[in-house]
Amino acid sequence: QPWREVNPETAGRAEEQMENLVRFLQTRGIVVHRPRPLTEEEEGFLKEYGTFSNQLFPRDSVLVVGNHVIEVSMRMVTRAKENFGLRDLFLRLAAERDCHYVSMPFNLPSGAFEPPRDTGPMLEGGDVAVLGHDILVGINRTTKSATNDGGIRWLQQYLGDAYRVQPVPLTKDILHLDDGFAAVREGLAIIMPEQFAEGLPPLLRDWEFVEVSKWEALNYLAGNGLVLGPNEILIDDRLPHVAEALARHGVTVHTITYDAITPWSGGLRCSHHPIVRELD
């Protein structure tokens, strides 16, 4: 049953906030592509393993790394249907541009209430941070809730020597790396330190940080900002102290109301996926 029928008020607020985000981006000259609605047949894909679907968070189901577009294999297998709404766009862009469009191996599904199990390589976009030719990939080996070691190996093997893929172990309460990590520019990031099970990755140890609490990261998605370019970011307006701290580092900070979206376990980074960046 559609969310807008179950709770019209909260659904309406969420739709309004998403449209406000789109308008903000468009007024800055950014071309925004939207997933198309799923057909009834697509909605029913693997329905025996769960019928829930949404298209709020395109970050997780695809990766764009250089000229590679990768449909990933997610832990919650019913989320695979989300790419049906994006595939026409990526096929068209792949034909227009010099890029490689591939899909990871599809995994054997497991039931929604079964214990997590590894049935193949699994990788989710929320775990992936591309920092030049270094790629950090979060992994929760305790809960096995998203990316696994097979997915990290697959990504390194696919990309080859041009990129260095580095696992980042996460603590048990954390779903994705971007719950508490956002690189605002080279050398500066928003972080929630408690999420790093083995401490900061060596790549980040000389960086400066704006720290957020675990509560802010899990409830407000405080580390989940939308980086518009080096030294410019859009964050949730419930985090004025984060905005002030970033401004002291010379960052241009924009804020937006997003409190009707974050209860679905995603923030501003989750809600978008940059395809092409053109920087001055």
Residue ranges and their predicted role:
Residues 1-280:
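The feature marks the mature, well-folded catalytic cores of soluble enzymes
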